[in-house]
Amino acid sequence: MIASAASAPRAICLLGPTASGKTAAALKLAERWPVEIISMDSALVYRGMDIGTAKPSAEEQAIAPHHLIDIIDPLDAYSAAQFANDANALIDAIRARGKLPLIVGGTMLYYKALTQGLSDLPGADPAIRAEIDAEAARDGWPALHAKLALVDPVTAARLHTTDAQRIQRALELYRLTGQPMSALLAREVGANAFQQHDAAAPYLTIALEPSDRLVLHARIAQRFDAMLAGGLLDEVEGLRRRGDLSPTLPSIRCVGYRQAWAYLEGEIDMAALREQGIAATRQLCKRQITWLRSTPERHVVDCLAPDYVDQVARLVQTSLESQSQ
């Protein structure tokens, strides 16, 4: 039990891009302190999606209690707002048990929702989404990315030309409001800057960032190959055989799954599956690092350093000691 849960950080947030060693570091912390782990990963919420998400094994999950893993069916959706609500409730419950909440993951929108709140943007509009999907089917997502660049160059500049989910949302918001998504978000941030800073203060945020991105890219390739060898295609084929899932769902849009689905549909060959899967993972990694670097309250640890786990532990120890004084 933590000596004084009231004096400890509200939660420790261990953030990092794909393949940065978050799980290994979290489990080492669990060996030293009485933590409960809250997953902050938009793919780990899905049941039956284990290999392509690098879900912690049953043995790993037995080391410490894990939360927000395997909580919904791939047919369903899970939002950043839902995560914030669930995580806040879990943090309070874990602290009440005298334990230390440890939030681990790389879904940075979830982190923003938890620590800063979300902007009050309009919800999804099925008619507009259907219209955008029809345009994409006819012209391709790169063409829609070009359309987005004309009306919202700031958002378009940070999106890959085939990032269907985010291009769709940005165009949807523009067509709903007549304003660029970037302007809507900037207005919200400006209006709530003080509250956001104040809300983020109780968290100890540690970011695992690579000193050499090429080394992380090599790790990503090795990891994707290991997923293929470990049965990713069989896992995705099982999802396809259900008959109620499609590549338009957020679950099947997850990196690795949409490429494997396309291969099983006969749309691409094995070489393209591997190439596209690795490229998509690297794009995800790039977005995650960009988000991390815009997080001023973080403590950076080089995830490629041989002693990176020890560095993380020292930051936690220092925080616990300073809070108890």
From Swiss-Prot:
Gene Ontology biological process terms from the UniProt entry: tRNA modification
Range of residues in the leader sequence: none
Higher taxonomy: Bacteria, Pseudomonadati, Pseudomonadota, Betaproteobacteria, Burkholderiales
Annotated region (Interaction with substrate tRNA), positions in chain: 41-44, 165-169, 253-258, 286-293
Species name: Ralstonia pickettii (strain 12J)
Subunit structure and binding partners: Monomer.
Co-factor(s): Mg(2+)
Record family assignment: Belongs to the IPP transferase family.
Described purpose of this protein according to its UniProt entry: Catalyzes the transfer of a dimethylallyl group onto the adenine at position 37 in tRNAs that read codons beginning with uridine, leading to the formation of N6-(dimethylallyl)adenosine (i(6)A).
Keywords: ATP-binding, Magnesium, Nucleotide-binding, Transferase, tRNA processing
InterPro entries: Dimethylallyltransferase, IPT, P-loop_NTPase
Pfam families xref list: IPPT (PF01715)
HAMAP family: IPP_trans (MF_00185)
Chain positions recorded as substrate binding sites: 18-23
Annotated binding of ATP, by residue: 16-23
EC number, as in UniProt: 2.5.1.75
Known catalytic reactions: adenosine(37) in tRNA + dimethylallyl diphosphate = N(6)-dimethylallyladenosine(37) in tRNA + diphosphate
Top class in the EC scheme: transferase
Site (described: Interaction with substrate tRNA): 107, 129
One function term, GO molecular function aspect: ATP binding
Protein name (record): tRNA dimethylallyltransferase
